Swiss-Prot record:
SMART domains: MUTSac, MUTSd
Keywords noted in UniProt: ATP-binding, DNA damage, DNA repair, DNA-binding, Nucleotide-binding
Function: This protein is involved in the repair of mismatches in DNA. It is possible that it carries out the mismatch recognition step. This protein has a weak ATPase activity.
UniProt superkingdom: Bacteria
PANTHER family: DNA MISMATCH REPAIR PROTEIN MSH1, MITOCHONDRIAL, DNA MISMATCH REPAIR PROTEIN MUTS FAMILY MEMBER
MF GO annotations: ATP binding; ATP-dependent DNA damage sensor activity; damaged DNA binding; mismatched DNA binding
NCBIfam families named among the record's database cross-references: mutS1, PRK05399.1
Protein name: DNA mismatch repair protein MutS
List of residues binding ATP: 616-623
Gene assigned in the entry: mutS
Transmembrane residue ranges: none
Amino acid sequence: MISEENFQQHTPMMQQYLKLKAENPDILLFYRMGDFYELFYDDAKKAAALLDISLTKRGQSAGQPIPMAGMPYHAVEGYLAKLVQLGESVAICEQIGDPSTSKGPVERQIVRIVTPGTVSDEALLPERQDNLIAAVYQEKEKFGLATLDMTSGRFQLCEPADKETLRAELQRIVPVELLYCEEFNEMAAIEHCKGLRRRPIWEFELSTAITLLNRQFGTKDLRAFGVEKSPLGLSAAGCLLQYAKETQRTALPHIQSISLIQNQDCIQLDAATRRNLELTQNLSGGTENTLASVLDKCVTPMGSRLLKRWIHQPIRDVEKLKQRQQAIAEILNFDLVDELQPYLQLVGDMERILARVALRSARPRDLTRLRTALEQIPALRTIVQQKTSPFLTALFSQIADFSEQWDLLQRALIETPPLLIRDGGVIAEGYHAELDEWRMLSDGATQYLENLEKRERESTGIDTLKIGFNAVHGYYIQISQGQAHKAPIHYVRRQTLKNAERYIIPELKEYEDKVLKSKGAALALEKQLYDELFDLLLPHLGSLQLASLALSELDVLVNLAECADTLNYVMPTFCDEVSVKIENGRHPVVEQVLKDPFIANPVELNHNRHLLIITGPNMGGKSTYMRQTALITLLAYIGSFVPADSARIGPIDRIFTRIGASDDLASGRSTFMVEMTEMANILHQATEQSLVLIDEIGRGTSTYDGLSLAWACAEWLAKKIRSLTLFATHYFELTALPEQLEGIANIHLDALEHNNSIAFMHAVQDGAASKSYGLAVAALAGVPQSVIKLAKQKLTQLEKNSSYSAEQQIQALREANHNQGELLFEQETDALREAIEKLDPDDLSPKQALAYLYQLKKMVG
């Protein structure tokens, strides 16, 4: 920015600025000057453009005008919020020296760095979603990933086995900042993330990470946290902790532990599945009409955030799920929703308030909200313990007795304090005797000045005489110009106005010094007492955090009970058999947005019926049917009740979806390539305990290619993997699969045509659909009737002239599959050679030979 040789040409103030800017060259520097934060040079130009503030000049330095922009210090939070939302980071530089005693520029220091992932101020945070920062480390083909929520202290790590798993984890946590090593070589896996920050390799050094983590937690080793055998995750965690300390410039006592996320403990959802199921974000990027938008009526922001974490990370611990179900049932049975929610609402965002207490950045109203939260605990405890069985009572065993902390805050703080401690008026009367004495001296000024004014009027005979005060000249005696000649000789003129003269007398000056001293002493003491409140609260931080987590969970359970009651959900049951059986299931989101009654449908998947071929018209409800099956399963595995008449669900390890696709222009991938990539991931990762949803595979290529791929994928899933699969297709030929393989069945969603119109029945029935209704759907979409008429003529002609009928295509695929000797499932490396060796051209018709040639061609390229 500024060359070294020109540095000495700058003013002392600008030299100080340039030194501080050099410490953080890549981020904006807010430089405190009196009552303003100012930015200079390129920072000023950038801030002016981003914040829509004026770009001006501040004199000259080194012979050049200095570009400058700024904002009042009291308005800085709004500007910071906008910059953070834009993904910018800001270094906050404050005056820490005393201007009255400083020689040269006042001493300044960067006191904190505000970044999107490390903010804790209420105004800068999205209230009902987590604000996470993450770090990723790579060693060969394996990864370490660590996440930190600065607003709660939640610190976690995991070790994704491959880049697909890494991508899925990043899709789950959606970090606002992602730190990555300078030697990271899988940028395609992280390039979609916000706030990418490249960090030096030494920040990921394992031994340094272990030392830093032990120092943070006050431990000798990390075995108590169960992370000691996760070196890649620890390397990422070490970088993350260094970054947090670097930006906060203070201790981080609310980060008290770290935990390992075990994939086997949760149902795995890949990135495509999270997107397709629209859990917390719809396909357009918004939050309307998502699962979370239907379920989330939590009365606390921290409960809302916890619910979204549950949705994105369903657990497989059936005993824990049953405990959640039991708690929801108890809340319903005792009609506790209306009784508990008013108290929970007053608890507020206790979790984030505690983080600000830990960082010593909590404002007076944070502490009064904490006081209010603590005040609700006894009433909540009484309700829960008197009316419910052991699970909710056990939840409250995590909540200690905070009567002493409540009493402290009750005595220390006034009822409704100002926003900031800066101007005082926060500490309550009676809390500290010395503070009360200084305040009495200061507050007694009004009576003293009234008495002095009355006395001086009487002694001088000047009826226009009055005593006033301003910040520049202090106290003064003011006399109108018409009576100024009557001023006594001991009145010393202080200021001349157009219509009056202002004077000072020794007695008033002496009193002014005394009052100003008392105000200054009172403010300094009040700030000291406010800081001491943090010292008194911090020893209890760990137990307070446990309480906030328990109250968050209670809020979620009460919320799910309310949903079950108002939305007519039922408690699902779990079984040991790998299966899903749902009676009259409903899509939890679609049923809320439909004006007409939702048509409920059953689904049954088990060992003998593990793949359902679903046919029917477009818009008939195939995708809705598949999605509702996945969402009902997911809801069961967060412990919620589900939208159905009944549900019985066995062990599920993963949920996969291949529903819909569009071009991935950023990565240069076509619709078909995106489709095949998602399908390949399913074929590699799915197991017998996976729930797989496949919708219209193979439509992005030619008919024969698409049919062959769809057939092969369905056969692989049914015969090799044996996962629980819903397989929707527009290839009617696939309805012959149940005749060939065990465990496959046909179902369809029907429609009725009448007088060139179509009515979708949305009801699932056994068997294959009789037709596709494609032309009827096209007419419904508004395609001109002349085009529909021409299409009907072409359809009749094609059906009449087709020499390669659907039956023949199916037979060719069957025979080709047989003659290949189960080529699809062959594990040998030289599969192509073996396939050709087994081929007997004399046994093939010309049509069969052509189909076989297509398959051989695909094998080589």
